[in-house]
Amino acid sequence: MGAQNTNCTMKFIDIPEDRQREAINTVALQTGLPPSSIEKDWWVTQVLKALHTLPYAEHIAFKGGTSLSKCWNLIARFSEDVDIALSREFLGFSGELSKTQISDRLRRAACSFVREKMQHDVRKALMDLGIRADAFSVDVVITPVTTTDPEVITITFHSLYEVSPYIKNTVKIEISGRSMMEPIEKKAINAAIDAHFSKAPFAEKPFEVNAVIPERTFLEKVFLLHEEFRKSEVRVERMSRHIYDLAMMMDSENKIADRAIHNEALYKAVLEHRRKFIGLKGFNYDELYPATLCIVPNDDIARLWQDDYKFMCEHMIFGQVPSFDELISKLSMLNEQIRQLNYRKA
């Protein structure tokens, strides 16, 4: 994959700015997204393309909410960040690992790789795609902590629009060496601009990425909710997206939710991976087995998340938008369905 030629003769950002705005506005009207989101989608797509032209592209996997929208078309939510799993075998860690190896050596190796090599590789890959060096910058905030995981590469791009606190002119790549790498599938993606103007001189053809299957993402979001609600201080900002994503996957035509929760091997694999590689302090991972799973927020948290969801609906979600009460109702139904499963720890 690393050797594929993904260049075209002209990049979208090379055409006159008035034509860029015109094209962006056309797609914005079609999708219901703000123009700045359409612009940012082009940059998110370029970042993904750059990542999948790296020499070690076979050792990365595209995961998280952005993969649900870009690869699987399961959610009508603009996802602005790119979550990447980096193979721990590629980093030199194979076989069974101790907690010390995970919490120190693996995290340190991933952090070092991102800071010392990957950020520079991404910058070169974007330029190799034909993007002018003055159109973007690449940065990693270097802190004294050398075990940061996930580590973040930030791409800041020149925007046609005034930067807002809701849709920033940055694409964040979150890279983790502790994530699961399997199961994945090859999926072809492209930017909304390219899909709409497929015959234009600047249009780029779809390209393949290594995408985590949505069933795994579904289970990871289920477990994340249970873990979150066990914390003394539950996060609020942009957290309601997880409930929305689960609800959309429950409604999907290809039965993502049913396939996820009834795949006992996958359920246990994701759970046990979180136990070993996430390992929240003081949390009993046996609680994630069906009999004790609790993914519905209490009334106090629900009120806070409802306000967060209102923000998400105004700025990040497009198309038909379910009410927050509908989301909670679906979540309660899902919780009951999972509770009826008889999976047990081996």
Enumerate the language-model features and the residues they cover.
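Structured mid-to-C-terminal alpha-helical surface segments
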Residues: 1-60, 72-76, 88-346
